[in-house]
């Protein structure tokens, strides 16, 4: 415990809040190139083959990003837009790929929540 005199001389240090999306460097999204597209299995009570991609961002950081939605057209060297947002059952996956931008196509036959998956409105 510091004395009053020590506090007058030095003061207290402010806590620095650590960002959850450090690789984006403060940007809302970042462009990147897929270096590897693969599937991985989730943590314990869940079971699936989750689609993820290793992405080298323009900030020269390589991150693992989740590919949301059913089906995708991504492969190595695809240009993608990455946003923050973790996937709870995939350890180490703290970013998501934005569907319907750059080389990523939107989800086919999507009727609801279309804007999240880059799906165009169906002609009726």
From Swiss-Prot:
Domain of life: Bacteria
Region called Disordered, residue ranges: 9-32, 105-124
Gene Ontology CC annotation, any one: small ribosomal subunit
Alphabetized GO MF terms: rRNA binding; structural constituent of ribosome; tRNA binding
Bias type Basic residues, positions: 108-118
GO biological process: translation
Signal peptide: none
Coiled coil regions in record: none
Pfam family, one: Ribosom_S12_S23
Key words, A-Z: Ribonucleoprotein, Ribosomal protein, RNA-binding, rRNA-binding, tRNA-binding
Gene3D superfamilies to which the protein is assigned, alphabetical: Nucleic acid-binding proteins
InterPro entries, alphabetized: NA-bd_OB-fold, Ribosomal_uS12, Ribosomal_uS12_bac
Record function comment: With S4 and S5 plays an important role in translational accuracy.
Membership in a protein family: Belongs to the universal ribosomal protein uS12 family.
Assembly behavior: Part of the 30S ribosomal subunit. Contacts proteins S8 and S17. May interact with IF1 in the 30S initiation complex.
Protein name: Small ribosomal subunit protein uS12
Gene name of the encoded protein: rpsL
